[in-house]
Regions:
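Acidic two-metal-ion nuclease catalytic site recognized across multiple nuclease folds
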Residues: 1, 159-191
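Conserved non-catalytic scaffold segment of RNase H-like nuclease domains
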Residues: 1-112, 126-147, 187-188
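Short, glycine/acidic-enriched loop or turn micro-motifs at the edges of active sites
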Residues: 12-14, 119, 155
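Buried hydrophobic packing segments
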Residues: 97, 120, 156-160
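Short, flexible loop segments at boundaries between secondary-structure elements
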Residues: 115-126
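Acidic, divalent-metal-coordinating active-site segment for phosphoryl/phosphodiester hydrolysis
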Residues: 148-162
């Protein structure tokens, strides 16, 4: 049976973190990256100066981009098709995703399995100076154009693959996220 992971990253237009202005998705099957996708997203809301500075995306950049609901038609099956989701600081990205799904009244499975590459790096690479994505990528010689969703999702996928090759355990680190209520559930998940 193929073990599939969907590494993803979102960028948000403002501090409310309830809309997405860019998304990156990288699919891993049996340790190999098999698909990579990124897109700007028209968030239908305002941008604040901090977030524009952080990710470099401005309102005019997303003016003709698809809205979240239209984009979800394309990427939703990847997220809800039984794959394990992966993100660096996964609770943040999952929280934003949960809020977007609720805002657009998109029905999904209530819970999804996920793994956080930041937690994995802390556990399996305690020797790193810190476990921010840019630092982990530098230490593992993984290319990164930070705060660009496409680059961040691909880097997350490569970090996950590297940590798994080095012996990280999925079973011991798998969690489940409640998309309906926007929170990590308290118990570990078994495969």
């Amino acid at each position: 049976m193929v073990q599939r992971f969907v590494a993803f990253d979102v960028e948000t237009p403002n501090h409310e973190n309830n809309r997405i202005c860019s998304v990156g998705v990288t699919v891993i099957d049996d340790g190999c990256i098999v698909r990579h996708f990124s897109s700007l997203v028209n968030p239908g809301t305002y941008f604040d100066a901090f977030n524009m500075q952080l990710c470099g995306i401005r309102p005019q950049d997303t003016q003709h981009a698809p809205g979240f609901a239209a984009l979800w038609e394309e990427i939703g099956p990847l997220f809800c098709g039984g794959a394990i989701l992966a993100a660096h600081n996964a609770p943040f990205d999952l929280s934003v995703l949960s809020k977007c799904l609720a805002a657009y009244r998109i029905v999904t499975p209530r819970t999804v399995p996920y793994i956080c590459t930041c937690r994995l790096a802390r556990k399996y690479r305690p020797d790193f100076p810190n476990h921010r994505l840019d630092t982990v990528c530098r230490m593992l010689s993984i290319p990164l154009d930070h705060h660009k969703a496409g680059s961040d999702s691909r880097a997350c996928a490569e970090v996950l693959c590297a940590l798994l090759r080095d012996g990280a355990s999925i079973e011991q680190n798998l969690r489940r996220y409640d998309l309906l209520n926007g929170k990590t559930l308290p118990h570990k998940v078994t495969l």
